[in-house]
């Protein structure tokens, strides 16, 4: 099946790997890992709507995450064998959704800090607003109309990268964030307001590993704990740093992804 998204390809043999990027980035996030593993796997990394070489979503701020998910499923459906899913943050969220939708097509998952806000809210038995207000008292991230404003972007960047990060960014560093601000805001709203309860992820029977940092936001580390407690047989690996480790500290992150793939090739992974 075809997809309107740009899909980056590396390698041509072995078990396919579909790698899903974080908000604000593109499929090229996975280039170094893909080049390292392309002798053993065919690797496909799409640019989601609004990023890289892919078109914008026709729905603007009314974007739904299912638009990206449908394209991921189309990519998976076009493969002639089961694939391994890799993901970071929003990409990890989509990977979990794809594995639930196509269990027969997904062999294993290795994800860096996938975000499951609905699962966190259901586990804590509270409205999502109660979760968000801890770090965003004005609930700016739930207001898509603020997309692209300095107050929204500062709240978003500082949450994921640490207090003061937005102020320290140069104009050149801010430019791609500002360019993708509408899609980022639409994604954030979609993911944060997703109501999928945590127990749904117990349906995943594939080998699952969750990678995480040491200084990531508390909510994200709680999500990791919830997933590993919910998904039978899942494992974790800890890497010094925070949520943006795949960009800021890629060598150990990619080493963990590569090790997971090697263990799969060696038959060392079991559900």
Model features per residue range: what roles?
Residues 239-254:
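Catalytic histidine-centered segment of alpha/beta-hydrolase-like enzymes
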Residues 20-22, 89, 213:
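Glycine-rich His-Gly loop
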Residues 35, 44-86, 90, 255:
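Active-site loop/oxyanion-hole signature of alpha/beta-hydrolase fold enzymes
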Residues 173-229:
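Conserved serine/cysteine hydrolase catalytic core
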Residues 96, 100, 105-143:
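Flexible "cap/lid" loop of the alpha/beta hydrolase fold
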Residues 29-31, 54-60, 120-123, 221-222:
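Conserved catalytic-core motifs of eukaryotic protein kinase domains, centered on the activation segment
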Residues 144-185:
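Conserved alpha/beta-hydrolase catalytic His-Asp/Glu region
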Residues 3-56:
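Conserved HGGG/HGGXW glycine-rich cap/lid loop of the alpha/beta-hydrolase fold
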